[in-house]
Amino acid sequence: MISVVSGACATITEEDIARLEPLIEQSSYLLMQLEVNLEANWRVLALAKQHGVTTILNTAPAQSLPDEILSQIDIVTPNEVEAEMLTGIPVENVENAYKAAQVFFEKGVKAVVITLGSRGVYVATPEKQQLLPVPKVDVLDTTGAGDAFNGGFVTALSEGKDLWEAARFANALASLSVQRMGTTASMPTRAEIDQFLAEHPEM
């Protein structure tokens, strides 16, 4: 079980956000998650859209979101539990992942990346859908796997990789992280990620 004690994360102010606007303006991507006060998230989202920044929402922890917010998200990265909460479709197989993605598209999201644990990651745009497999690994601790995936995903996008290659890179990062205990301490080096990808061309 993962518990959230928001603390300072629930107290982000308009002044805090205003100080960040120059950084947002210079950015290519904005990655958000739901462990901060939501009004702060939506203010940052508005700034990102104002400056033409690609917006990515990691929908953790799972909760319902208004359609007017989802319509401003370029890429959404839920796990299967979060995808079901936001679409009403249990993501138990690829067919249902496809259906869930269609619901997100109807809400205005441009790309959907659903992490499916040991089943891999389902990546979809209105034009292309694909399940990317994940190699079997010895799982020790899944805490932080979603953070590992999302961090790797945005890193790869910022390096110019397309949606599918970015998801593949993120899959590798998360696969390595779950083989170690902890969160920050479990994150692999870039060399380890590149080696893992080279050893698993089937990903």
Question: Language model features by range: what are they?
Answer:
Residues 6, 16-17, 29-99, 119-121:
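Conserved beta-alpha-beta core of the PfkB/ribokinase-like small-molecule kinase fold
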Residues 11, 77, 187:
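Short aromatic/basic micro-patch
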Residues 63-69, 94-203:
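Conserved phosphate-binding/catalytic region of the ribokinase-like
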